[in-house]
Amino acid sequence: MTRISSDDVRKVSKLARLEISEEHVETYANQLEEILEYIAQLEKIDTKNIPPTTRAVEVVNVLREDIVDKSNVRDKILDLAPNREGQFYRVPKILAE
């Protein structure tokens, strides 16, 4: 069994930039140990005759032919803008020059 120390939890939380209070460090250490035990069980499973897959159910794209259609959606959307300039949205400046 892999033992996760409190120092390990602190190190991982620092690398992940997560703030963990001292009162939760031991809890997370125990939870990480349980996760690693579960992974160790999964590693023991014989998967030699199981083909690799990316999903449990095969997904098939249903393709359709593109149809060009005239629309005035752009104007309708622009009419909803609180502030616009011609055919463009006008947004507040967020970056300094």
Curated annotation (Swiss-Prot):
GO biological process terms held by the UniProt record: glutaminyl-tRNAGln biosynthesis via transamidation; regulation of translational fidelity; translation
InterPro entries: Asp/Glu-ADT_sf_sub_c (IPR036113), GatC (IPR003837)
Keywords in alphabetical order: ATP-binding, Ligase, Nucleotide-binding, Protein biosynthesis
Pfam families membership: GatC
UniProt key word Protein biosynthesis: yes
Catalysed transformations (reactions): L-glutamyl-tRNA(Gln) + L-glutamine + ATP + H2O = L-glutaminyl-tRNA(Gln) + L-glutamate + ADP + phosphate + H(+); L-aspartyl-tRNA(Asn) + L-glutamine + ATP + H2O = L-asparaginyl-tRNA(Asn) + L-glutamate + ADP + phosphate + 2 H(+)
Enzyme class name: ligase
Database matches in HAMAP family: GatC
Function: Allows the formation of correctly charged Asn-tRNA(Asn) or Gln-tRNA(Gln) through the transamidation of misacylated Asp-tRNA(Asn) or Glu-tRNA(Gln) in organisms which lack either or both of asparaginyl-tRNA or glutaminyl-tRNA synthetases. The reaction takes place in the presence of glutamine and ATP through an activated phospho-Asp-tRNA(Asn) or phospho-Glu-tRNA(Gln).
Protein name: Aspartyl/glutamyl-tRNA(Asn/Gln) amidotransferase subunit C
Organism: Prochlorococcus marinus (strain SARG / CCMP1375 / SS120)
Primary gene name: gatC
